[in-house]
Each structure stands twice: as C-alpha cells, then as structure tokens.
Amino acid sequence: PIPAMSMISYASGSRYLSLIGGVCLSFYDWYCDLPPSSPQVWGEQTDVPESADWYNSRYLIAWGSNVPQTRTPDAHFFTEARYNGTKTVAITPDYSEVAKLTDHWLHPKQGTDAALAFAFGHVILKEFHVDKPSAYFTDYCRQYSDMPLLVRLEPRADGRLVPERYLRASDLGGLGEANNPEWKTLAFDDNTGMLAVPNGSVGFRWGEKGKWNIEEKDSAGRATRLRLSLKDANDGIAAVSFPYFGGIEHERWTAAKFDEVLERNIPVRRLKLADGKEWMVATVYDLLLAQYGVDRGFGGGNVAKGYDDDMPGTPAWQERITGVPRADVIEIAREFARTADKTKGRSMIIVGAGMNHWFHNDMNYRGLINML
C-alpha cells in the first residue's frame, strides 16, 4: 500500500495489514529505507551528502548497507576512499559483498544493532568526554546539539525521579521573552553563571527575524558559552531513573536481565519556577552520560567501572546480546572517535535499509546518531 499509487490501494492495504496484526505508522516508515529517527531527532527528513563525499572520510563504517549490491553505481566511491587511505569497517550479520571491501567485519546477531551502537557510545563517552575530554567534541556538543539544555526532573508517586521535558522560558515567567516563551529552551551560561535563552529553539523560528540560528548568543545577542555539565556547579546529586529494555526475551538473541528501571546519580540544580514550585533540573549531557552507564564518580549503582563489567552499555554487556567480541567493540570505537577528533569530524557511517527492517528501528538509528 503506497499513497502515491492510489488512496484506494493504500486504504485497503493498510486495513489488511492492521487486521493481520501489523502496525501502520507514517508513510516515512513504509519503504524502510528512510530512517524515522532522523525526523524524530532533528525534525527533518534524512539529509546526507552525496556518495562522492565518502572520499573525504578518514574512517568509514558501512552499517547494514551492502554497497556493492544495493548501491552498485556508488560502489566505486567506496573503493576509491580505501585507495585514499580511509579505514573501512563492515557491520552486517552475514558475510556480504561489502565485507570483502573492508578492513574489519563485525557480525552482530540480527536485530541487535542498537546494543552494539550503545556499547560504541559508552566507550566514546568514557574516553573522549570523561577520561580525556576532546575539546573538539565538547565544543561541537555545546554549539550544535541540545546537550547543554536543561531538563526538568519529575518526582513520581513512588518517589523516583524521571526526566520530564525541557525547561522553558515560560516556566520562569518568560524571562523577558515576549515572543513564544513556551517554545524557548534554557541553559546555564558559563560566562555569567546565570540562565540564558540560547538561539536556535523553535520559539525563534517565527516572529523574530534573524534569530533562528545556532550562533553562540542568547536572545539579546550577548555571547554565551553554554554549560554542558552541572558537575562543578550543582545543588547536589540526585538518583534519576532510566528504563531498561535489554531483558526482553527474544528468539534471536540472549536477553541481558537487569531491573526494568535503573537508577543512576547525576548532578542537579534546584530552581523555583513561576508557579512557586521547586523543580530539580539537569542537562541533557549529564542525562546522556548516565543513560550510557558511564561512571563519573557520583556514587550509586548501575554504573560501569570498566569495560568488562556486566552492566548495561558496556562492551561486555553487548557481547552477550550481539555476539561481537568486546575487544573489537573497544578497538573500533576508539579508532572511530580518535579519527573524528584528529580530523574534525571526518568519520562517517553509511547506513542501509537493513537497519530499518525492525520494529523500534528508530532505536537502532538513534545509537548511530549519538556516535556521530
């Protein structure tokens, strides 16, 4: 059922699939070659450079993309990149044609790509953000991502704290923002130590010409340096709860059993909002590091001291699920991140439709987005 053919075939096909237990989402998902995670994360359809740009990479991963077979006209760009000195890796469950063109071949069990990407991310965050922070990575996260933005932490009836939503200017009475304060996010500015309304959120898109951009300025045009972490400027450490789905049984892989809710400690600030209530807030960056189980010295459980710990997110944990040796995960993650650091981002991933042929395929793709 394709809408572009006729609404009759689309409607009847959708009805049939629903009756046999299928789940119909958006047309974006039907082809399974365009990842739904892209508009979920960025609000835009997949927008990538042309294949000729592979030549400019210095580390190239073909993940679920059998380039010689499914992208035959582009295959020569892949080979030419190798002649240019680019290191290549294939990640496919089978020894496909692309695996013959690469320096390394990783073969995770079908459907376990998210666990593999999660472990890659754990290594990258630990070594290039915590142990020896990369100035290039942290500056990139500060300017081009939502990682400095503040998130409200909601206390549940059982006493647990969970991430709720972004803190908005409207939560604090507008902070002088007359235009769409309910759509403007907040962060702390290292220059002043105060809350700032940084450019770039959707609240700037309409009504304020020239301000919908990611220049490192606040809404008044003052230069900012957004604070990524509250580690050195907080009102305390709080245990925040994160869901865990790796224990779900499946015939294709081994479940890694842990509690369905994992608590991890992160630094927080306490703010009194316009309604008089006090809320704890944390940065996206701190929440992300906690989600990946990276130990930052805040105490508490459910964090990994080393890569061999059987803790969600570690190379050892993913080995149980994917079957990929932990040593290979550590090596590829280090090389991928080190190359990106030294070349200012010239590590690339070619993602194929094989990543999208799964329910919850957006989780596969989000893991890769975080790596990049």
Residue spans for each PLM region:
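Glycine/threonine-rich flexible loop motifs
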Residues: 67-78
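Anionic-ligand anchoring segments at beta-strand to alpha-helix junctions in alpha/beta enzyme folds, i.e.
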Residues: 2-56
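Conserved short loop/turn motifs at secondary-structure junctions
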Residues: 1-5, 66, 316-321, 351-358
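A short helix->loop->beta-strand "cap" motif at the edges of active sites that frequently abuts
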Residues: 80-88
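A glycine-rich, hydrophobic/aromatic-adjacent loop/helix-cap motif
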Residues: 310, 316, 328, 332-372
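Short, polar loop motifs at secondary-structure junctions
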Residues: 91-97
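Long, well-ordered, tryptophan-enriched scaffold segments
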Residues: 99-100, 104-342
